[in-house]
Amino acid sequence: MPKKYGVKEKDQVVAHILNLLLTGKLRSGDRVDRNEIAHGLGVSRVPIQEALVQLEHDGIVSTRYHRGAFIERFDVATILEHHELDGLLNGIASARAAANPTPRILGQLDAVMRSLRNSKESRAFAECVWEYRRTVNDEYAGPRLHATIRASQNLIPRVFWMTYQNSRDDVLPFYEEENAAIHRREPEAARAACIGRSELMAQTMLAELFRRRVLVPPEGACPGPFGAPIPGFARSYQPSSPVP
């Protein structure tokens, strides 16, 4: 595989292992083959070790002395937990923004919202979503919260949301609610919008993993994002803002 310039080799290895996991090529309990990764990516064992340290910290793999690295539990509950954490953690920063919104930040968020509303293509919409989150988090999340948010997003693949055709219709109402809550200075409403968005994203991601047969839906579960909730995962929030 050719080297990706501008991307750290460690990050390239992390992305590769996560892709193997999300495509079903690595499953719970599987051993991570360092030699295979080194050969496939054309990297040394140093960035592979660095990647495994990060993935162990993030709960994706566990290392066993003299035995190697193994994939941790990866199931419906794992996906739900990652998204739940993402919603809660982003909700902290968003609630802080609502508690103390400055004219500068409100202006920046409104500009991103205009781009979100005008983005009809999934990739452009996803880029605007990340810009909105960056704007909030760079201003209101400290280094520790920033790092924890990044770790929670490992199993929320950007490539999927850049190609998912319904991302705008599904996700935009939550950003409308969050932005309005920040303007109204309502921290709990801003937090709830983040949590609701993450809940919907979790069900959408699970539906795709069920379709790929990477995961098996629990008996009696409806994998669709707008059907009955997956057992153990009740959607707590519905946006009221329509998609224009």
From Swiss-Prot:
SUPFAM superfamilies the UniProt entry points to: Winged helix' DNA-binding domain
Q: Which InterPro entries match?
A: TF_FadR/GntR_C, Tscrpt_reg_HTH_GntR, WH-like_DNA-bd_sf, WH_DNA-bd_sf
Spell out the protein name for this chain: Uncharacterized HTH-type transcriptional regulator Mb0044c
> DNA binding happens at which residues?
34-53
Q: Which residue spans adopt a coiled-coil conformation according to this UniProt entry?
A: none
**Molecular functions (GO terms):** DNA binding; DNA-binding transcription factor activity
Under the heading SMART domains, the entry gives: HTH_GNTR (SM00345)
Domain of life from the UniProt record: Bacteria
Q: Where is the HTH gntR-type domain?
A: 7-74
Kindly give the PANTHER family that the UniProt entry links to this protein: GNTR FAMILY REGULATORY PROTEIN (PTHR43537:SF45), TRANSCRIPTIONAL REGULATOR, GNTR FAMILY (PTHR43537)
Q: Is DNA-binding set as a keyword in this record?
A: yes
Pfam families reported in the protein's UniProt record:
GntR (PF00392)
Task: Identify the PROSITE patterns for this entry.
Answer: HTH_GNTR (PS50949)
Q: Which UniProt keywords apply?
A: DNA-binding, Transcription, Transcription regulation
